Structure formats: structure tokens, C-alpha cells
Amino acid sequence: ELGAQLRFAPGERAYNGREGKNSLFNLSKDAPVFKLSHQMGLKNVLGGDFNYNHTEISAEKRIWLSSFGHIDALVTAGKVWDKVPFPLLIMPNTNQSITIQPQAFNMMRALEFVSDQYVSFYFTYYMKGWILNRIPGVKWLRLREVISFSGFYGGLTDKNNPALDPTGLYRFPEGTSPMGRTPYLE
């Protein structure tokens, strides 16, 4: 598999870590970040079984709401351009643990939906104690409010649907299906 990624973040300032240039990190998420990535699978190259092309584009931004906290927003879209078996299709990132995982769907089952083209969004509002700090006796706990809203909408073309074109495709596991016309929201 070969891959390339372009990243554009106007106004971002990177800082060196302990290992010098090889450990750059960003202290601020105020600058918008735009990414374009492409992965290519090559059949018969380094043991590759399939030719495929997968493209993703994303935009990420932190929106400050003064003393009311901030919203982290991420919008992503992607497409698989070729006929591929289901392990190479797009499956939304799911969270099966009890901890909060960024950019993951907490209520969706693993392998519930597959698609070869999709758009998703993740909005997380960090209220920084705006409500809980006003409740007497609770402020000393330093609890913070986090509200998230996420969505995923994808489609599966006929060439990648084993129910319509079974030649060369694996059947979906039980409980896995293409998305219908309704987006998934949580």
C-alpha cells in the first residue's frame, strides 16, 4: 500500500519536543487544519491482493465561545474508487469501551455499517464548568461538561455490494449492512 497526505494549517505554530525536529507538536488548535490523503493498493506488489484507491478529505477547527468554552469541529469525507472486498471498505470508527474516544461513535456496533463513500462530522462542546460551577457544593469537585454530536452518512455502490454483484467479493458478516437513506446521528 502506498499513501500520501497533504496538510494545510494556516496560522499554526509548531514547537519542537525533546527529540528535536522529529517531534513537532502543536500547543494550540486555533488554526483550521485541512487534510487530503490518498491510499493506493497495488496487486502483486509486496504481497498485495487488490488494486484499490481510497481518498479522504477533512477540515478541523476549534471555535472559541469566550467564557462559554469551545467547540471542536471535524468534518470528513471519503471515497473508495474501486471494487474491493468488505475489509477494505469504509467502516465508521466505533467505541466499545466505557471511556470517551474522540471521533468515534459510542452507540454504534462494530461493523454495523459499511460504505464506499461517506461524509461524517464530529462536534464536541467543552463547557469548562459553565453549568456545574454554579451549583453550590459541586464546584469544588471541578467537574466539566462535555456535549458531543456526531453523524455519519455513507453509501455503497452496486459494484461493492456482494448482494448485487457477488463475483470476487466476500459476503458481509452477520449484522453488517450498507447504510440506508437515513444518516446515523448520536
Question: Where is each model-derived feature located?
Answer:
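Exposed, low-structure sequence patches enriched in small/polar residues
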Residues: 1-186
